[in-house]
Each structure stands twice: as structure tokens, then as C-alpha cells.
Design a protein with these regions (language model features):
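Hydrophobic beta-strand positions
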Residues: 4-5, 34
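N-terminal intrinsically disordered, cationic/polar leader segments
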Residues: 7, 11-20, 63-65, 69
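Amphipathic, hydrophobic secondary-structure cores in small proteins
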Residues: 11-50
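C-terminal structural segments of small proteins and small subunits
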Residues: 43-71
Length: 71
């Protein structure tokens, strides 16, 4: 799973699978789900993310994590 933040559009993309979406559905105002060809969730796109959430912190609970840092 990867989190991508795009400040130019203030959108947060939560990627569950590294495959392209075949279909998108807006499931709520400003929340789009991407589905693969089998209808499985690939990721979520959240518009106006910084206005909806505090993006300055990220907390995980009981997840087996492998951390990487962006260059």
C-alpha cells in the first residue's frame, strides 16, 4: 500500500495494488474508488484532502511495515 499526496490538486491517493484502474466510481462527494478489470479495489482518490484530514501525521497500528523514504 502506498500513499501519494499531490499538493497541486490537494488530492490524496491510497494505492492498494500497483495496477492501473479499469473503472472509476465516485462513491461519495470527493471520494473516487478505482477498480481493476475484475472489479477489485485498486485505490481511493480523495479530493481536498488537507481540508478533510490532518495530513501532518500518519499513525499505523499493528501493521507489519517496511518503510521507505522518497528521494
Amino acid at each position: 500500500m502506498k500513499l501519494h499526496y499531490y499538493p497541486e490538486t490537494d488530492s490524496l491517493y491510497i494505492e492498494f495494488k500497483p495496477v492501473p484502474g479499469a473503472e472509476t466510481r465516485e462513491v461519495a462527494d470527493g471520494l473516487v474508488v478505482d477498480l481493476d478489470e475484475r472489479g477489485e479495489v485498486v485505490g481511493f482518490d480523495i479530493d481536498l484532502a488537507s481540508k478533510r484530514f490532518d495530513l501532518s501525521t500518519l499513525e499505523t497500528v499493528a501493521l507489519p511495515l517496511h518503510t521507505t523514504t522518497a528521494a
